[in-house]
Amino acid sequence: MAELATIARPYAEALFRVAEGGDISAWSTLVQELAQVAQLPEVLSVASSPKVSRTQVAELLLAALKSPLASGAQAKNFVQMLVDNHRIALLPEIAVQFEALKNAREGAADVQIVSAFPLEGAQLAELVTSLERKFKRKLKPAVEVDSSLIGGVRVTVGDEVLDTSVRARLAGMQAALTA
């Protein structure tokens, strides 16, 4: 998938430069919507059909969006460029890279929190606050429940992993005892 990331990067960077001139959050929403629409098998089928013109494919993509930016000239040009260059399948990766650029600009990061039990409200807020102090940046949490952890949490921020789960501790003890 590194190849897709390499091809998608210039598109994400160009779109981010355009977004810097306006509302980055609105552009982020637009590119996320485009990525979701582009993953639909029906859309990919229509996009690869020789019976449908490139202009029609671009119009179809834009018509499926809720974002108010979809009617703007810049969004239309971006989508038309992707269609003309047969890069619709790159939209999910473009969205990932756009979000990474947005987070870098905001000094933020996405955090994946996997817990043995559901985390909500004050408990989640307290955990996120302590993680923000540890990682020294604003974090945007995505919480997942995995009962196989037995207890504790596993936190992933970028390429850093903090695993305080009971399962990880047991695995560590097992490794120490069998070594």
UniProtKB/Swiss-Prot annotation:
<keyword id="KW-0406">Ion transport</keyword>
<comment type="subunit">
    <text>F-type ATPases have 2 components, F(1) - the catalytic core - and F(0) - the membrane proton channel. F(1) has five subunits: alpha(3), beta(3), gamma(1), delta(1), epsilon(1). F(0) has three main subunits: a(1), b(2) and c(10-14). The alpha and beta chains form an alternating ring which encloses part of the gamma chain. F(1) is attached to F(0) by a central stalk formed by the gamma and epsilon chains, while a peripheral stalk is formed by the delta and b chains.</text>
</comment>
<keyword id="KW-0139">CF(1)</keyword>
<dbReference type="GO" id="GO:0046933">
    <property type="term" value="F:proton-transporting ATP synthase activity, rotational mechanism"/>
</dbReference>
<dbReference type="InterPro" id="IPR026015">
    <property type="entry name" value="ATP_synth_OSCP/delta_N_sf"/>
</dbReference>
<comment type="function">
    <text>This protein is part of the stalk that links CF(0) to CF(1). It either transmits conformational changes from CF(0) to CF(1) or is implicated in proton conduction.</text>
</comment>
<comment type="similarity">
    <text>Belongs to the ATPase delta chain family.</text>
</comment>
<dbReference type="GO" id="GO:0005886">
    <property type="term" value="C:plasma membrane"/>
</dbReference>
<dbReference type="InterPro" id="IPR000711">
    <property type="entry name" value="ATPase_OSCP/dsu"/>
</dbReference>
<keyword id="KW-0375">Hydrogen ion transport</keyword>
<keyword id="KW-1003">Cell membrane</keyword>
<comment type="function">
    <text>F(1)F(0) ATP synthase produces ATP from ADP in the presence of a proton or sodium gradient. F-type ATPases consist of two structural domains, F(1) containing the extramembraneous catalytic core and F(0) containing the membrane proton channel, linked together by a central stalk and a peripheral stalk. During catalysis, ATP synthesis in the catalytic domain of F(1) is coupled via a rotary mechanism of the central stalk subunits to proton translocation.</text>
</comment>
<dbReference type="Pfam" id="PF00213">
    <property type="entry name" value="OSCP"/>
</dbReference>
<keyword id="KW-0997">Cell inner membrane</keyword>
<protein>
    <recommendedName>
        <fullName>ATP synthase subunit delta</fullName>
    </recommendedName>
</protein>
<keyword id="KW-0066">ATP synthesis</keyword>
<dbReference type="GO" id="GO:0045259">
    <property type="term" value="C:proton-transporting ATP synthase complex"/>
</dbReference>
<keyword id="KW-0472">Membrane</keyword>
<keyword id="KW-0813">Transport</keyword>
